[in-house]
Every structure is written in C-alpha cells, then in structure tokens.
Design a protein with these regions (language model features):
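Bacterial N-terminal signal peptides that target proteins for export
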Residues: 1-9
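Bacterial N-terminal signal peptides
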Residues: 9-19
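Residues immediately within or flanking Cys/His clusters that coordinate Zn2+
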Residues: 28
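Short cysteine-rich clusters marking metal-coordination/redox-active sites
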Residues: 31-34
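Cys/His-rich metal-chelating microdomains
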Residues: 37, 66
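Short, non-ligating residues that shape and space the ligands of small metal-coordination modules
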Residues: 40-41
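Beta-edge loop/turn motif
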Residues: 54-64
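C-terminal partner/receptor-binding element of secreted or periplasmic proteins
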Residues: 114-152
Length: 152
C-alpha cells in the first residue's frame, strides 16, 4: 500500500513538473506585452535587453516601441527584424511604416524596414505613414498600450 502511494505521488509530482515546464515554454514563446504568439510573427519581432540583463521579446514594433518608450531609462540595447529579410537590425537604423492596411501582428500596425526604399515601396502598396526610429518612438509614446479592437 505504501509503495502504491509512493508511486502515485511520484507520478503526480512528475506530471506537475512536466506541465509547469510546458507552460513556461509556451509563455516564453509569447509576446510579453500583448500575449500574441511569437511563432508566426518572426519577421516582426522586437527584442529589448534591459540593464539588469533581462531580455524580453515582443511580437512586433507596436509592442516593442511601446515598451522602449515606457522603460527607456532601463533599456540597454534593442533589435528588431526587418520585415522583408527577417534579419535582426538596430531599430535606430530602421524605417517604420505605421497603420498600413497590412496587419501582420498588432493593430494599428508598426512594421520595421531596414531600407527606407523598401518601406516606401511597401507604403505604395499598403498605405500608412513612414517614420524614422526617433519619430516612431515619439508617436508610439502618444498612443495607448493596447491594440485597436475592430467592432468592439
């Protein structure tokens, strides 16, 4: 009887351990601001490393720029993905298109481009307003944290 109880408790312990590990892995693959999955949004990802060494991944510049503006004094470094190539870049060297008809992640969309010419071509097809990095930070700081929810 004691052996059966020990086996049962051992099974329950390991089941809870595996469930917790699975939950942690799932949460690590979600945007830390809005909770959107990072998988599927790889070309819009935005990462910030804070002074204490904590690294946060956001699904897109909508979330990343917001956190960058609200925690600017604690930001050590950041990087964002170029929407076209998917390459990591310094956001300060990027051009951003705001509120285009294309919404790959959050809405209103902020989409980063490593090349201003590519941003202009994208804008011709999908609309939106072009901002430099500094302009994007200034504009994003004026906006609320969350997303626009159509029809709500």
């Amino acid at each position: 009887m004691k052996r059966n109880m020990a086996v049962l408790f051992g099974f329950l312990f390991f089941s809870l351990l595996f469930a917790a590990a699975g939950y942690a892995a799932e949460m690590a693959s979600k945007c830390t601001l809005c909770g959107m999955n990072i998988a599927g949004n790889e070309n819009t990802a935005y990462e910030i490393v804070y002074m204490g060494g904590t690294e946060e991944t956001y699904c897109c510049p909508h979330c990343g720029l917001y956190m960058h503006t609200t925690k600017k004094d604690s930001v050590k470094s950041s990087r964002a993905r170029d929407f076209i190539s998917g390459e990591w870049m310094d956001p300060a060297q990027m051009t951003f298109v705001f509120k285009s008809s294309a919404v790959p992640a959050c809405s209103p969309s902020w989409i980063g481009f490593g090349d201003k010419t590519a941003a202009k071509k994208f804008q011709k097809g999908f609309g939106g307003t072009i901002y430099s990095y500094e302009e994007a930070l200034t504009e994003r700081a004026k906006m609320p944290k969350g997303m626009e929810m159509k029809g709500m």
